[in-house]
C-alpha cells in the first residue's frame, strides 16, 4: 500500500489508476468509468472521496514540521487526498462500497456523472460517508435533515454537527435518496499552498469511521431534505447553512473572517429563486494578453452562477480570481 506522501504526489489520473489496482487487490470488482471509480462491497455503507485537488503544480515534496504538520511548497492537496487515504485504510478491514469521484473541485463533475448511471439506483447501502471536510471533529450533513441519521452519526463518532458548503454527497444524496455525512479528514487551509495535514487528526477520523460503520442501524436512512421557511427566513435544520462561507472562503489569497457574516447567502439565494429573478456574476481573472479579463454568468442563484463559471473554466482556482461581484 502506498504511503500518504505517495498519494499526495500523484496526479488525478495516477490516483485513479492506483486506486483501481488497490481496490482490486482487496477483492473488489472495480468499475472504471468517465468521472469515477465505483466498487461495490459487502458492508452496506458507501465511502466517498474525490481524487482531484485545486493545485495546478504537481506536489513533488512533502515536509513534516516539528509540530507534526505535513505540508508541501506546491500545496499538499489534503483536500482530498486525505479522504482517499482514509478509505484505503478502512477497506483493509471493512469491505464497504467505495465511490471515488473526479473533478469535485470544479463542480462535483464525477459525482454528477455517477448520478446519471444505473449504479445510483442499486447501491444497496444504508447511508454514505464522505471524507472531504477540514478540521478534526466536524460532521456536515448539508441539506440532509433526517434527525434519526444525524443523531446516529453524532452518537457513534463523537463529532459535532457543523455547517458546510457543497461537496459530492450534496448531489449524491437526493439522487440516491439516502442520507450522508461528510466527516473531518485532518486537513487545514484548503485551496492554498499553505494547506497542511495533521496526521493524528486523520487517524482519529479513521477510528471514528470504523465505529460508525460497525454500529447497528435499522435499515437505510432516507434522505430528508431541509426546507426553506419563507415566513421566518430560515432553513429547517439545527443550523442555518451559509453556503459560501466554506465553499469560497478566499479572495486574492486572503481568508475572510467567518464572524463577519450576518446574512447567510443561502437565504438570499432562496428568495431570489422564488421570485425567479436572475442574478449576474462578474468575475475578473488574470489574462496573458490584457492582464485582466471579465467573465459574466447569470442564473437564478449564486450557486448556479458559480457552478457555470467553474464548469467553463476548469483550470482556474478560486484563489486566482482577482475580484468578483453579483448584481
Stretches found by the model and what they are:
Residues 38-78:
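Catalytic-core environment of secreted peptidases
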Residues 45, 160-205:
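Zn-dependent metallopeptidase/amidohydrolase metal-coordination segment
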Residues 2-43:
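A non-catalytic alpha/beta surface segment that caps or lines the substrate-entry region
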Residues 39-40, 118-123, 173-175:
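Solvent-exposed alpha-helices and their adjacent loops that cap or buttress functional pockets
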Residues 25-32, 64-66, 157-161:
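Short secondary-structure junctions
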Residues 54, 74-151, 161:
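Acidic/histidine-rich catalytic neighborhood of metal-dependent amide-processing enzymes
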Residues 189-254, 258-260, 265, 283, ...:
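His/Asp/Glu-rich mid-to-C-terminal helical/loop segments that flank catalytic regions of hydrolases
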Amino acid at each position: 500500500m502506498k504511503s500518504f506522501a505517495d498519494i499526495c504526489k500523484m496526479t488525478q489520473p495516477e490516483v485513479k489508476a492506483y486506486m483501481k489496482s488497490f481496490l482490486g487487490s482487496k477483492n473488489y470488482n472495480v468499475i472504471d468509468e468517465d468521472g469515477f471509480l465505483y466498487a461495490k462491497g459487502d458492508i452496506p455503507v458507501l465511502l466517498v472521496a474525490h481524487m482531484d485537488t485545486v493545485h495546478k503544480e504537481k506536489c513533488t515534496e512533502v515536509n513534516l514540521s516539528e509540530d507534526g504538520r505535513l505540508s508541501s511548497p506546491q500545496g499538499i492537496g489534503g483536500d482530498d487526498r486525505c479522504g482517499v487515504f482514509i478509505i484505503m485504510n478502512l477497506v483493509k478491514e471493512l469491505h464497504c462500497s467505495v465511490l471515488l469521484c473526479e473533478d469535485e473541485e470544479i463542480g462535483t463533475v464525477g459525482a454528477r456523472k455517477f448520478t446519471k448511471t444505473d449504479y445510483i439506483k442499486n447501491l444497496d447501502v444504508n447511508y454514505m460517508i464522505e471524507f472531504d471536510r477540514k478540521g478534526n471533529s466536524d460532521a456536515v450533513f448539508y441539506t440532509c435533515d433526517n434527525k434519526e441519521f444525524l443523531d446516529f452519526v453524532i452518537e457513534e463518532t463523537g463529532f459535532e454537527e457543523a455547517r458546510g458548503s457543497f461537496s459530492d454527497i450534496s448531489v449524491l444524496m437526493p439522487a440516491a435518496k439516502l442520507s450522508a455525512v461528510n466527516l473531518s479528514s485532518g486537513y487545514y487551509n484548503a485551496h492554498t499552498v499553505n494547506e497542511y495535514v495533521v496526521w493524528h487528526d486523520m487517524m482519529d477520523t479513521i477510528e471514528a469511521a470504523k465505529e460508525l460503520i460497525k454500529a447497528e442501524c435499522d435499515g437505510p436512512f432516507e434522505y430528508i431534505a431541509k426546507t426553506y421557511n419563507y415566513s421566518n427566513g430560515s432553513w429547517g435544520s439545527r443550523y442555518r447553512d451559509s453556503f459560501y462561507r466554506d465553499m469560497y472562503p478566499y479572495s486574492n489569497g486572503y481568508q475572510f473572517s467567518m464572524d463577519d457574516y450576518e446574512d447567510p447567502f443561502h437565504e438570499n439565494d432562496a428568495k431570489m429563486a422564488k421570485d425567479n429573478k436572475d442574478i449576474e456574476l462578474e468575475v475578473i481573472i488574470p489574462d496573458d494578453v490584457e492582464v485582466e479579463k471579465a467573465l459574466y454568468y447569470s442564473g437564478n442563484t449564486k450557486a448556479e452562477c458559480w457552478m457555470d463559471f467553474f464548469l467553463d473554466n476548469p483550470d482556474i482556482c478560486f484563489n486566482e480570481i482577482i475580484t468578483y461581484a453579483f448584481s
